[in-house]
């Protein structure tokens, strides 16, 4: 009943600005061609790589875009976000989505992807945008001769210099990740939509790591994310989500094999920098015994908690939500895992139960566990639950992340799920983890802050 975040390669290695590559559409509505394209290989591992592409508009505003390039060494795009990709052999075309097609003068649009390679992974030699070959400059034309004026030529009004974009600083002790889908959507938006999406983009949220990439790539993601948080003097939040038999084959089904899990966790743990909060395996205990293929799930959780804690993590074992299991069940299962290498448990991950209900439920569990601490995911619980768990409509953003020290056992309110990322292909939503702007705006609009 939980969903993963879209996997994305985030390391700032091998970044390549492709010769100031520029182009823009030549249609009458989108004239004055000129832009910059930055193609950055952000991470690379045997057989795979991640990349980010940023388009900066140096000409007139455009309402949609299509970027074309050709791979010459057999590279292939496997998963792309913030755009739609089509390929024909080595030829690649990426088109804008309904919500990020508009680029004002001086504005940017970006997308990212994971790809495959073999032998070599050279940067594409050229790009074209909306049919115009990238040249690196705004094309010039011969000016039409100006007749001699009979009146003094007025002094033209100076064009103001665009104000550089500044990454806002987070307002709490938790880290705001500027690489999330919500953050990129906010950057691309304008008007009322931008004001609403700011509520999501500038609120600290967890980074999900799972087996949608191999273990070494997942380790690199963790190292990059936690490293950026530590450099900013903030606390990172991670979700580890790769347990065998994950989600019992539902919308977020998957996980690594039983024989691979310990090695996968150890590899990922090697990437930890600082002391991140880690939510360990959403739904794993709540679904214990519900399907085959789980192996020694309690043993896996014990091992993962130890491996992560020894590398500096503060581990909270996920225990479901307030309307799922009676108090006795999570108490029994959490006791089986134990707390030698965990500071507490987590509730309401990716769910919609109110903070009040979740806190009352957590306190009952905590009392039975000798006062163990707990955290609550409040990312989407502002209107509580309507009984649905997969993309219910009419929900709202919940309380913003904050550390708690009120003597109740509650350690923190966190945004574990990333609002705007789909729960799965249900109720009109895209696949799990994909950005869904419509529901992001709805939850932001319904928020009580």
UniProtKB/Swiss-Prot annotation:
Its EC number is 3.2.1.4. It holds the Pfam family CBM_2. Disulfide bonds join 35-134, 248-291, 390-426. Residues 139-168 are annotated as: Linker ('hinge') (Pro-Thr box). PROSITE patterns: CBM2, CBM2_A, GLYCOSYL_HYDROL_F6_1, GLYCOSYL_HYDROL_F6_2, TAT. Residues 132-141 have a biased composition (Low complexity). It catalyses: Endohydrolysis of (1->4)-beta-D-glucosidic linkages in cellulose, lichenin and cereal beta-D-glucans. The keyword Hydrolase applies. Keywords: Carbohydrate metabolism, Cellulose degradation, Disulfide bond, Glycosidase, Hydrolase, Polysaccharide degradation, Signal. One of its GO terms (biological process) is cellulose catabolic process. The linker region (also termed 'hinge') may be a potential site for proteolysis. Residues 142-167 have a biased composition (Pro residues). Residues 438-449 are annotated as: Catalytic. Residues 1-31 form the signal peptide. The active site is at residues 247, 283, 423. This is Endoglucanase A. It comes from Cellulomonas fimi.
